[in-house]
A protein has these predicted regions:
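Conserved alpha-helical substructure of the radical SAM core
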Residues: 2-99
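Glycine-centered loop/turn positions within well-structured domains
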Residues: 7, 74, 109-110, 139
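Short, hinge-like loop/turn segments at secondary-structure boundaries
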Residues: 91-95, 118-120, 158-160
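Conserved C-terminal portion of the radical SAM core fold
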Residues: 40-49, 70-77, 98-101, 123-170
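Residue-level signal for the nucleotide or nucleotide-sugar donor/cofactor binding architecture
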Residues: 25, 58, 120, 148-151
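Short secondary-structure transition/capping segments
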Residues: 87-90, 112-115, 152-155
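Conserved sequence/active-site signature of Rossmann-fold short-chain dehydrogenase/reductase
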Residues: 17, 107, 144
Length: 170
């Protein structure tokens, strides 16, 4: 959806940049893409809105609602920045969001935030996860395993396993 992102993740493969690229799809172009995805059904495949950080798109809620109106299930993979709030998650759920993909690269702020390059990301991730539970949104936890966090996987498992709404990808 966008390459724009406010994090500085050590492993980023999206070549994230602080602001949106002018060549990104416009709202109308994104809606046309959703129309094409809708034709791939029935049922249409899950559309995962990712980036960068999809929260950097001001039309995110509009696009989720548009997809829901076309019976295209939507998940999104946000960055845990101040843009990702409980209110925004509630708004996206009301628009039709089915699933949320969060990155958890450590069992504590020291490990996770070092991986993400910005302090406070772990706490925002946990808050987003809690909001998703509250609104009964399925959550996929993604973990990039490296030498920085391999030793921490057992502790991360204790965080992830208790939730029936979660899939964990490592």
């Amino acid at each position: 959806m966008t390459r724009a992102c406010d994090l500085a993740c050590a492993h980023c493969r999206a070549e994230a940049i602080p602001t949106r690229d002018p060549l990104e799809l416009s709202t109308l172009e994104a809606q046309a893409l959703i129309d094409e995805v809708a034709w791939l059904g029935p049922p249409p495949p899950l559309l995962v809105m990712t980036g960068g950080d999809p929260m950097k798109r001001p039309d995110l809620t509009e696009l989720v609602a548009y997809a829901a109106g076309r019976h295209v299930p939507v998940a999104f993979s946000p960055s845990a920045t101040p843009l990702l709030t409980r209110g925004v998650i509630a708004e996206l759920k009301a628009a039709g969001l089915k699933a949320l993909s969060l990155s958890v690269d450590g069992s504590c702020p020291q490990i996770h935030d070092a991986f993400r390059g910005i302090p406070g990301v772990f706490e925002r991730t946990m808050a987003a996860w809690e909001a998703a539970r509250e609104f009964e949104i399925k959550v996929q936890i993604n973990t990039t395993v490296s030498r920085l966090n391999l030793f921490d996987l057992p502790r991360m498992a204790h965080i992830v396993r208790p939730s029936p709404w979660v899939t964990w990808n490592t």
